[in-house]
């Protein structure tokens, strides 16, 4: 549904028209309505539309609006007709004009809206092919341009951001481009026409958009029925995770203990997923509950401005995708995150010991070289393959006594 000359339907207070004057052929003119081209006009128009759309949604009508374009979503053909009629009457009652030529008022299951294709049969939102082709071409051109400017990189980033509703993984593959742009602006005193040097990671992101983004065009808008729950919490001493009815925890290494709490919280989510995800989780949505709002934001936004946190977030999403899982994070007050909090503070320090590496190396050289460490953790294992006594991020197996050793000679 499209509004005709939408801005011009909004009158300007008589005393304020003098601020909207312009000169044309020696004559002085002033706007008596909201003009196009005014930088504040989109925000003003959006605020004017708020109570109107509020009225529509108060009737249980689901709608999506961007400035003067609106889509109405209804559960059936008949309901769609009723909802559309109510929206039209509401808009007309406050003085707006419907652009009948550009509006699609007949109920349909497939429609183009704001450069996207909404398909209620497959329940997906996809990018129009022409927009997808433009993104691929611009990404490829920028990647291979020997003297690309900061402005050119910024324009590509803008194109990428505009695809977020349709290409879900786009959020995961543009952060290093943004980092390169920001660093280049700092080095060149905000001169957008200066040359922009890209890191290898940024080039890899452009390569992804040039060659692979089309594979992920189409985001599902269907609610997932299969859900698995993970709760996570971190303290300065360790981490704790629950997954469904399973528990695990661990201590931080000396290096990890020096990290910021936001890093620890996000790392806890990664360690928990590494400990529990398996092929049986495929097709599920992993709902993560955490009492750290930064960790929640990074997971849901597929990254952020801090490089170290962005790297962990990338690992989280790559891990979930490798098991055909999706992930959503939710904030939970610390007082309600009881089990994970307790696990993050409860540690058996006496279990985290090992032979001195030099001693172990001497024994391995003079007697035998084991290929499996049977009682170890991610902090004290001595060989590449190890068995932990509880779920562990990198363990080959859990509980050495429960492993079936059918061929002792094979280790």
Feature map (PLM): residue ranges:
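A short, polar/acidic, helix/strand-boundary loop motif
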Residues: 26-48, 141, 244-267, 271, ...
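C-terminal reverse transcriptase regions that engage the nucleic-acid substrate
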Residues: 105-221, 334
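Polymerase palm active-site segment centered on the conserved acidic dipeptide of motif C
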Residues: 62-64, 72-141, 154, 221, ...
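Conserved catalytic palm subdomain of right-hand nucleotidyl-transferase polymerases, strongest
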Residues: 1-12, 152-155, 230-232
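Conserved pre-motif C helix in the palm subdomain of viral-like polymerases
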Residues: 7, 28-60, 148-172, 273
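Active-site palm subdomain of RNA-directed nucleic acid polymerases
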Residues: 42-90, 272-290
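RNase H catalytic domain
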Residues: 273-339
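Reverse-transcriptase-like RNA-dependent polymerase core
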Residues: 4-29, 45-55, 121, 126-130, ...
